[in-house]
Amino acid sequence: MKAKISDVAKIAGVSPTTVSRVLNNRGYISDETKKNVYKAMKEVNYFPNDIARSLFNKRTNLIGVIVPQTSNPFFGELVLHIESICASLNYKVLLCNSLNRIDKEEKYWEMLIRNQVDGVIAVTYNRGILDYHNQTLPIVAIDHYLSKKIPTVSSDNYSGGIQATELLISKGCKHIIHINGPIKLETPANLRRKAYEYVMNEQGKTPITYEISNTFDRKIQQEVICKLFDEHPEVDGIFASDDLVAASVIVEAQKRGKDIPTELKVIGYDGTETSQALLPGLTTIRQPIESIAKKAIEILTKEVEGEFNDLPLETSLPVKLLEGTTT
């Protein structure tokens, strides 16, 4: 027979009302009482009804997370931290892989609203598919600008761009090229390109940026990299938009007989655990992925609690240069 709240109360030596207050975190309950209630729950194998609790609290304790694709190391690691932090705060995560498709993203938004999520963390590229200005649902964006009213959390992309470009110059590179994602997207990541251009201009060098219109399409990525080498055989330094692009650059360069780092120096961006494990020698700018996840959740939970005062609209977290053997 399925255990009831009254069974838990009897074993714990408290009233059913007290058990309910413990489960819903309502009112003052001593640590000893909480301990006895949880012990009794475990003893009778009692699991609280999430639907009933959501009706009582007027919350579902669900957080929606929309990402382009978790197969990308950056997004995969980001989601891992988000899920872990949410679990520690008693939130469950509804994960949505949009594959950077507008139709999928729209359907996911509808699904999240139907499931009455308490809030959404959006790592989305398709700005404009929704009227974000009129969204009443608490939203925090990561690495993207969705609306002037929606908080954005990212790494310090400008500082990262400065450090990457200055490193290549300090290593003696004369012809440095930057590979960027879609420039038309209004994202903090575009600050990497602006920083690169600033340093190049300050040093009297001509900045050249190659754009990958869809960074998730390996074919397009490869075509851009090949075009870069064909048009600029003199290139001796490349600042890539992420570690995956940097890895592809290294592979193509080696196919063309270029020695890394003697003839070509390469630096990436992200510094995920996966990229560091597979390419331990890659010089890169490490994003504080766990800190980004923590800050996004911190802001979102404040929104959920109705604490809108003094919420930062833009949070930029420090990056770190990891110098390897590719520079």
What would you call each of these model-derived segments?
Residues 68-77, 95-103, 153-163, 179-226, ...:
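Hinge/beta->alpha junction and helix N-cap segments in small-molecule ligand-binding domains
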Residues 1-60, 74:
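N-terminal helix-turn-helix DNA-binding module of bacterial transcription factors
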Residues 18-21, 55-69, 167, 175-182:
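Short beta-strand segments enriched in small/hydrophobic residues
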Residues 175, 207-209, 259-265:
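Short acidic capping loops at alpha-helix termini that bridge into adjacent secondary structure
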Residues 15, 118, 173-175, 236:
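Short acidic/polar active-site loop segments enriched in Thr and Asp
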Residues 231-327:
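Flexible loop/turn connectors
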Residues 3-6, 58-166, 229-230, 234:
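Alpha-helical recognition/docking segments in bacterial nutrient-uptake
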